[in-house]
Amino acid sequence: MPVLLDTHAFLWWCEDSPELSLKARKVMTEEDCFVSYVSFWEIAIKLNLGKLRLPGIPDRYLASQMSLNGFEQMEISFRQIMRCASLARHHGDPFDRLLVAQAQEKELAVVSRDAVFDVYGIKRIW
């Protein structure tokens, strides 16, 4: 089953962080993994605010990690953006709300430690 990676899951995979659960690691090794453009947007904002640092030049680093790990990019559609308007307000984070909309539309599980995905009826792997 293909999976959509939450931003932290993608970054922790790239860093080989111990924060990433063993179950998440297993799934990310065995399944097709998608990283949404919304995660790249979130990363760019955090870089700009000084809340995140990446080794090397960010766009080159992220592109090389995507290629090296065989992850696929997921574009954001108008329909997915508009789907956010109908989501219950369980989660205020606009990045995660868009990941919810994408996961629902594409029927994907989400790799995330954030339990708020559970209330949207999405399979969460952690």
Locations of regions flagged by a protein language model:
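Short glycine/serine/threonine-enriched helix-capping/active-site loop
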Residues: 35-38, 76
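Active-site neighborhoods of divalent-metal-dependent phosphate/nucleic-acid chemistry enzymes
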Residues: 55-63, 67-113
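Active-site regions of enzymes building and remodeling cell-envelope glycoconjugates
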Residues: 121-126
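Short, well-structured N-terminal submotif of metal-dependent ribonuclease cores
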Residues: 1-36, 49-64, 106, 115
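Acidic active-site catalytic centers that drive phospho-/nucleotidyl reactions
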Residues: 6, 42, 96, 114
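Phosphate- and divalent-cation-binding pockets in alpha/beta enzyme and binding domains
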Residues: 42, 83-86, 119-120
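Generic structural signal for small/hydrophobic residues in well-ordered secondary structure
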Residues: 7-8, 43, 84, 103
